Amino acid sequence: MKLPQPLFQGTLIRRYQRFLADVELEDGTVVTAHTPNTGSMMGCACPGNRVLLSKSASLTRKYPHSWELVQADGTWVGINTQLPNLLAREAILDGTISELSGYRQIRGEVPYGSGSRIDLLLSGERGLCYVETKNVTLVKDGVALFPDAVSARGQKHLRELMEMVRQGHRAVNLFIVQRADGVALAPADAIDPVYGRLLREAAQNGVEILAYRAEVTRTEVRLERALPVLL
């Protein structure tokens, strides 16, 4: 998936109020950028980090800049949580995610569960497949970890995926690791032990747990390979 161009390089001053970040651009201008990520962004929101921002052409946006990438531990990291659904759809269609091939239709944001919307609903002769995507930006010692903060929403999604399996459907929790230095994925038990317990319970009860790593450059984010999941 091509990133919007041009991207503006700068230095992170601070992230605050979850969705805002102050960035000093290369010309010395300080801008406030929208941060499309609700997580803690542990390890990715350190003052002084190099970041790349896109800029909307809209004249009505209060904050025209959006934070797209950050350089952490020497690698570019995609922090935009709106991308995983698009990346997953693209990778399903081009065959990269072979586990999810063979479906005729892909729909997004379909209501299901207890007031939730499934990220991707695949359908066809194989029946229905409910796919929940999760963006992963935290890596420690080569292992990508999720979540980076306690995630009641993520816990709820796992329970709903288990319910879909009980109803006879296929259900998949798909982790999208938007950085190239992760060699495996594991639940972040030290951060959210409840999520870790539920992820293992979901796997034991028929929910498929997949992880795919993206190649992230200044111009493109593209899923490239599956990662082992350590439960």
Curated annotation (Swiss-Prot):
Transmembrane annotation, as ranges: none
S-S bridge residues: none
Molecular function via GO: DNA binding
One Pfam family, short name: SfsA
InterPro entries: SfsA, SfsA_C, SfsA_N
Signal sequence annotation: none
Gene3D superfamilies documented for this protein: 2.40.50.580, 3.40.1350.60
The organism's place on the tree of life at top rank: Bacteria
PANTHER family: SUGAR FERMENTATION STIMULATION PROTEIN A
Family: Belongs to the SfsA family.
Name of the molecule in the record: Sugar fermentation stimulation protein homolog
Naturally occurring in which organism (per UniProt): Geobacter sp. (strain M21)
Organism phylogeny: Bacteria, Pseudomonadati, Thermodesulfobacteriota, Desulfuromonadia, Geobacterales
